């Protein structure tokens, strides 16, 4: 995979692609011009009419020219990017839930999980993507053990995205430039297809080099440079009309000096004495780590669909993903950095997944059934190790090499089966489903005896969880343009490895691992309607209006034990009355998150537009630091209200699309502090409201087949803003993005 993203290979494929241009023209009788669709969710796609689903297609993705995957989908209602703008500093928040275990992320069907302390959780290169699907909430039995907020499915490009009819070999070149951080992006592809058109291969590489971002006041977000290389190999083999095999492989690397906490913004400057002692360069680097990150993803899919057998539609998938971050501080760095992964650290998260399912279609009297049955096996592994040079002579710290007490190593195994019957009768679709999960958590003993002391409650033994989840859905097509829907699910999740096996030293107030945790459970309900009107004002136009209300009731929330440690201190006076051994995590009583979304989309041959509005509010039954208290508190991770709007026009004759997009965000001042003044550790700073305006243009010159020019201007008015979920990290200033691409 490194070959793909080497610059010399980029130049080689460039030369090959130029030669292929002549061949491609000879092999194709159709124009290679792009048909520019409106930069909105396509209302004509039936998959977009599913409740709670938002879709970004390839044109949407390419026009945004986003630097990271989280920022790409930030435009969707109910979806927000959390964190800052440094590389690898972004997480996702869907309808007020933002923990990594709440938002399920998949790349080509492979689960991606990364929960490193103070880091982002998503490292997918947008240049690779052809489609992003966001399913909000957990209403499908195909997904279990978490993912309460929803599932984000990223799909990589395919050979068919580049090939014309009857084309056997093709190429692609792209150059991009961003003004804010002087970013240069280079992408190239080589595409092959056999004579029978049943085998195609895509080789795709992308290089992204950027300097520091600038804030609206023109100051730099120091150490936000990006040096990233990514490669993709994707093979489709239609073995026969009934058998399809797909293999995809993604590999990305990122290296550079950056703050340990990638999600944060402001970096304290080195003192004058440090500069005098070490020099400016080393004085700054003493506050940084040199990060070597590798992200890889492999998926093998097999589909069997007999032509005349409605009982069989078999799908099998085997996937493996791994993310590795190795951080090293300079030798001049101080010691005693246990709380920030020491002087050097080696962190790896991996996911191994196997899924097999079959869908049978049959009739019972006047009803049509689609019966889905599947089996799943998943393995999540977390390997962590750090080196703290201040502990090099201490045997109880294994002479400096041990696992961070707040990031234990361990494995989680999931065995599951699921069943769903979707019943269609006249204009009503009723679905019911069940899922059973059996979870095995297995901790790994810490190498440091300081965190491996059974008398302090450091117990890394296996813990098992199991249970059923239930799903109901109803969709009623009132007529050809109005659909009403409602969904309900009752699901649960087991603790992740960090929650189960985090420790502290014996003398601390909460030293123990958390083997007494119960399952966290949630009941989710949503209701709404979809109106779809075609040929409303003119031929071939479309209008869609969607409204959704959701209500989530969570119980036994898994949360850190801080503040009031036991029921004996419910009055919050003195924790000395509590037992000596307290677990690091506990179950809080519960919470309610509810909200609404309104969406309107219009598109026609010449005009398109959209308006969306999302509102979420959430409260815990008690304070996060006192589960025995009587005062409810706001949930800190609830995003402020957000509205987006877009308006643009197409000029089909000239293959031109021009548009404007705006985002309006309300202030957020609801804080746990209003219910518990001592809950500052679980609060985010209040934020002011703001509005951002963007412009975009896409043009495919008619005389140069396959060429496309895109221009996007982000933050047109250079407005200063601080996103609430970024903990008031500054937004970036005006950014003019330009790209030029050529298909051969």
Swiss-Prot record:
Gene Ontology CC terms: cell outer membrane
Signal peptide coordinates: 1-24
Domain (TBDR beta-barrel) ranges: 168-744
Membrane topology recorded in Swiss-Prot or TrEMBL: Multi-pass membrane protein
Domain of life of the source: Bacteria
Similarity comment: family membership: Belongs to the TonB-dependent receptor family.
Name of the protein in its database record: TonB-dependent heme receptor A
Organism expressing this protein natively: Haemophilus influenzae (strain ATCC 51907 / DSM 11121 / KW20 / Rd)
Record gene name: tdhA
């Amino acid at each position: 995979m490194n070959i793909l993203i080497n610059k010399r290979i980029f130049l080689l494929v460039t030369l090959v692609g130029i030669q292929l241009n002549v061949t491609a023209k000879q092999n194709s009788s159709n124009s290679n011009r792009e048909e520019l669709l409106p930069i909105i969710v396509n209302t004509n796609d039936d998959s977009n009419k599913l409740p709670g689903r938002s879709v970004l297609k390839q044109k949407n993705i390419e026009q945004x020219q986003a630097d990271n995957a989280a920022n790409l989908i930030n435009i969707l209602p109910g979806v927000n990017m959390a964190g800052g703008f440094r590389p690898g500093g972004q997480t996702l928040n869907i309808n007020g839930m933002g923990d990594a275990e709440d938002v399920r992320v998949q790349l080509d069907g492979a689960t991606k999980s990364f929960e490193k302390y103070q880091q982002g959780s998503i490292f997918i290169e947008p240049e690779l993507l052809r489609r992003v699907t966001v399913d909000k909430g957990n209403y499908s039995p195909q997904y279990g053990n978490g993912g309460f907020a929803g599932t984000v499915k990223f799909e990589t490009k395919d050979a068919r995205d580049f090939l014309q009819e009857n084309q056997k070999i093709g190429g692609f070149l792209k150059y991009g430039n961003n003004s804010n951080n002087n970013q240069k992006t280079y992408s190239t592809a080589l595409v092959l297809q056999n004579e029978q058109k049943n085998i195609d291969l895509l080789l795709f590489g992308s290089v992204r080099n950027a300097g520091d971002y600038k804030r609206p006041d023109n100051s730099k977000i120091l150490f936000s440079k990006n040096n990233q290389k990514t490669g993709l190999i994707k093979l489709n083999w239609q073995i026969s009309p009934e058998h399809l095999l797909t293999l995809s492989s993604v590999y990305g690397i990122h290296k550079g000096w950056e703050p340990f906490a990638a999600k944060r913004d402001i970096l304290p400057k080195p003192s004058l004495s440090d500069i005098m002692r070490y020099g400016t360069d080393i004085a700054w680097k003493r506050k940084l780590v040199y990060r070597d990150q590798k992200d890889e993803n492999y998926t093998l899919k097999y589909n069997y669909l007999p032509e005349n057998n409605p009982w069989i539609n078999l799908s099998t998938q085997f996937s493996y993903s791994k993310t590795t971050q190795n951080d090293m501080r300079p030798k001049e760095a101080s010691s005693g950095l246990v709380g920030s992964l020491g002087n050097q650290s080696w962190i790896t998260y991996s996911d191994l997944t196997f899924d097999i399912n079959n869908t049978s279609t049959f009739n019972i009297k006047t009803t049509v059934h689609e019966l889905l049955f599947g089996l799943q096996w998943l393995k999540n592994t977390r390997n962590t190790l750090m080196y703290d040079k201040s502990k090099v002579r201490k045997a109880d710290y294994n002479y400096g090499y041990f696992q961070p007490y707040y990031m234990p190593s361990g494995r989680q195994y999931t065995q599951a089966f699921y069943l769903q019957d979707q019943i269609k009768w006249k204009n009503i679709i009723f679905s019911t489903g069940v899922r059973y999960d059996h979870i095995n958590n297995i901790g790994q003993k810490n190498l440091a005896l300081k965190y491996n002391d059974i008398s302090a409650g450091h117990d890394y033994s296996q813990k098992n969880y199991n249970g059923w989840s239930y799903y109901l859905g109803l969709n009623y097509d009132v007529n050809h343009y109005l659909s009403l829907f409602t969904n309900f699910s009752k699901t649960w999740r087991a603790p992740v490895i960090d929650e189960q096996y985090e420790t502290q030293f014996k003398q601390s107030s909460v030293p123990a691992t958390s083997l007494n945790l119960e399952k966290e459970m949630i009941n989710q309900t949503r209701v709404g309607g979809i109106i779809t009107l075609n040929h409303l004002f003119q031929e071939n136009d479309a209008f869609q209006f969607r409204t959704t209300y959701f209500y989530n009731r969570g119980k036994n929330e898994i949360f850190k034990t801080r503040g009031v440690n036991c029921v004996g201190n419910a009055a919050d006076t003195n924790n000395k009355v509590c037992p000596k051994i307290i677990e690091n995590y506990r179950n809080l009583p519960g919470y309610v998150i509810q909200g609404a979304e309104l969406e309107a989309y219009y598109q026609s041959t010449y005009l398109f537009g959209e308006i969306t509005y999302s509102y979420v509010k959430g409260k815990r039954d008690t304070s996060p630091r006192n589960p025995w208290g009587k005062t409810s508190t706001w949930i800190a991770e609830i995003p402020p209200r957000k509205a987006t709007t877009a308006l643009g026009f197409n000029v089909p004759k000239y293959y031109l699309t021009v548009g404007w997009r705006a985002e309006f965000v309300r202030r957020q001042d609801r804080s746990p502090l209003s219910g518990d003044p001592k809950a500052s550790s679980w609060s985010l700073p209040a934020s002011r409201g703001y509005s951002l305006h963007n412009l975009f243009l896409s043009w495919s010159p008619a005389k140069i087949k396959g060429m496309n020019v895109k221009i996007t201007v982000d933050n047109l008015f250079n407005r200063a803003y601080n996103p609430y979920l970024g903990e008031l990290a500054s937004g970036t200033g005006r950014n003019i993005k330009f790209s030029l691409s050529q298909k051969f």
